[in-house]
């Protein structure tokens, strides 16, 4: 099938959250399966620093009383064609900024629709999050193009101002809706990035005021778990690590722990229980829980803690203060570093994700891949990826708690600390996690079945592509 991915992010070129990982990884696997997949995203001002882009556009289009240019390149490390939507409104060197995001991304979505109608006509437009929410509305009347809409985070639904309704051909009965709601109503298929999250968003607790609409469209709503790039995240070959290792050579992992302790100024003690966290410092990620229990945990145990990430100034300040009270045992790195994150995955004993909600989560899958035992709250994709350790039956891949309460999180963390003392059982726990399959191939098969369902094909039907290019309109 001819499939056009339309999104605001695509790793490794532009990434803020998990959407960038999906758009940067899934098309590569789908192309290997035989689909003709291409990506359409904004031409941000920082992209020329990361990829070679031709000076001349392949097509010039018009949308919302504006002229835009489309440039063609290739997603780095792949053969996936990448179309870049060029307009001065996307020239600044950040992805998200200012108060006009609704106008900019609706304009971008309109440009993608014009491109699909007039230059390269796909069979399916795969839209990602609110930035592309109007595309299913516009495509609803086109019998030749169907749409799939993926919810990466329902909490971000897209603003809507009255002036947009005058220039986007919005149906009168949708005036005042946000672009996420528009996509939910008009897309042929809707999916979230984990099965559990697909069920949770139909409830008031997680539905972000759209639970009624989501329940109404439940017949076309499903959940497909994200994957990770198992070649990129591979402890047996990761150059960021001091020592590579596999599930069968876990004893080599000790060198990474010592190297991490030395790098971050922690006491060098291979026997200490080292807990890591790589996260945005926002409430969604459970920072309020962590702040309430970390002092007590470090005082009660001989553990160490390392945090990597940036976010709300309040949480940054609180974490700095805790680190100052435990020199040599708590390291807070308020920055983004892909290399350091890999060293934390490869050197820490456990990895915490006490999220208030989590559509999918990728960090816990990377942690499992590296033998870093996850300690998570059972919500969203964390339910689908981490199973609770049962020491008697020797099952499970991590430690889990249910209620979003400090005591529950603290109790779970202490249980993991106690479990770490039983080295044989702990190594078996690490090995079970490292042998889990979170490859994108598994996810791509599920998306292939989703695409097939639109056309009434059996889920296992594999593509027989016959790509066509509609001549450019000049």
Curated annotation (Swiss-Prot):
Q: Copy the pathway line from the protein's UniProt record.
A: Glycan biosynthesis; glycogen biosynthesis
Q: What function does this protein fulfil?
A: Synthesizes alpha-1,4-glucan chains using ADP-glucose.
Q: Which BP terms in the Gene Ontology apply to this protein?
A: glycogen biosynthetic process
Q: Which NCBIfam families match?
A: glgA, PRK00654.1-3
Keyword Cytoplasm assigned: no
- Reactions mediated catalytically: [(1->4)-alpha-D-glucosyl](n) + ADP-alpha-D-glucose = [(1->4)-alpha-D-glucosyl](n+1) + ADP + H(+)
**Recorded family membership:** Belongs to the glycosyltransferase 1 family. Bacterial/plant glycogen synthase subfamily.
The EC category is transferase
**Annotated positions binding ADP-alpha-D-glucose:** 15
The record's Pfam families line, in alphabetical order, gives: Glyco_transf_5 (PF08323), Glycos_transf_1 (PF00534)
Q: Which domain of life is it from?
A: Bacteria
Keyword presence, Transcription: no
Please list the GO terms describing molecular function. Answer: alpha-1,4-glucan glucosyltransferase (ADP-glucose donor) activity; alpha-1,4-glucan glucosyltransferase (UDP-glucose donor) activity
Assigned EC number: 2.4.1.21
What is the recorded name of this protein? Glycogen synthase
Q: Which InterPro entries match?
A: Glyco_trans_1, GS/SS, Starch_synth_cat_dom
């Amino acid at each position: 099938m001819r499939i056009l991915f339309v999104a605001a992010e695509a790793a490794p070129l532009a990434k803020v959250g998990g959407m960038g990982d999906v758009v940067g990884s899934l098309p590569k696997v789908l192309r290997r399966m035989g689909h003709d997949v291409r990506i359409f995203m904004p031409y941000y001002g920082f992209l020329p620093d990361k990829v070679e882009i031709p000076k001349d556009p392949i097509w010039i289009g018009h949308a919302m009383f504006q002229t835009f240019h489309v440039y063609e390149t290739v997603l780095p490390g792949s053969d996936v064609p990448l179309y870049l939507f060029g307009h001065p409104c996307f020239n600044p060197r950040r992805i998200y900024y200012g108060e006009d995001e609704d106008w900019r991304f609706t304009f971008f979505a309109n440009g993608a629709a014009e491109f699909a109608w007039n230059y390269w006509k796909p069979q399916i437009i795969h839209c990602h999050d609110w930035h592309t929410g109007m595309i299913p509305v516009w495509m609803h009347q086109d019998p030749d193009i169907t749409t799939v809409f993926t919810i990466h985070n329902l909490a971000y639904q897209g603003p809507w101002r009255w002036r947009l309704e005058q220039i986007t051909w919005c149906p009168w009965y949708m005036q005042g809706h946000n672009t996420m709601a528009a996509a939910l109503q008009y897309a042929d298929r809707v999916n979230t990035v984990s099965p559990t999250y697909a069920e949770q968003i139909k409830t008031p607790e997680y539905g972000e005021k759209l639970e009624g609409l989501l329940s109404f469209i439940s017949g076309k709503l499903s959940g497909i778990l994200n994957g990770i790039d198992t070649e990129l995240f591979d402890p047996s070959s990761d150059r960021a690590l001091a020592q590579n290792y596999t599930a069968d050579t876990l004893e080599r992992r000790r060198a990474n722990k010592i190297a991490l302790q030395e790098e971050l100024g922690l006491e060098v003690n291979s026997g200490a229980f080292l807990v890591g966290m790589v996260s945005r410092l926002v409430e969604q990620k459970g920072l309020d829980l962590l702040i309430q229990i970390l002092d007590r945990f470090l005082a009660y145990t001989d553990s160490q803690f390392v945090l990597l990430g940036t976010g709300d100034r309040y949480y940054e300040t609180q974490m700095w203060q805790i680190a100052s009270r435990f020199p040599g045992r708590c390291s807070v790195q308020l920055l983004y570093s892909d290399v350091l994150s890999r060293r934390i995955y490869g050197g820490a004993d456990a990895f915490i994700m006490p999220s208030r909600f989590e559509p999918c989560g990728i960090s816990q899958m990377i942690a499992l891949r590296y033998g870093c035992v996850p300690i998570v709250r059972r919500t969203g994709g964390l339910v689908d990826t981490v199973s609770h350790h049962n020491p008697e039956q020797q099952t499970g891949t991590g430690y889990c708690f249910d209620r979003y309460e400090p005591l529950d999180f603290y109790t779970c963390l202490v249980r993991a600390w106690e479990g770490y003392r039983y080295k044989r059982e702990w190594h078996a726990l690490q090995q079970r996690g490292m042998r889990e399959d979170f490859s994108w191939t598994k996810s791509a098969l599920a998306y292939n079945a989703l695409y097939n369902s639109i056309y009434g094909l059996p889920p296992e039907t594999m593509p027989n592509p016959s790509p066509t290019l509609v001549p450019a309109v000049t």
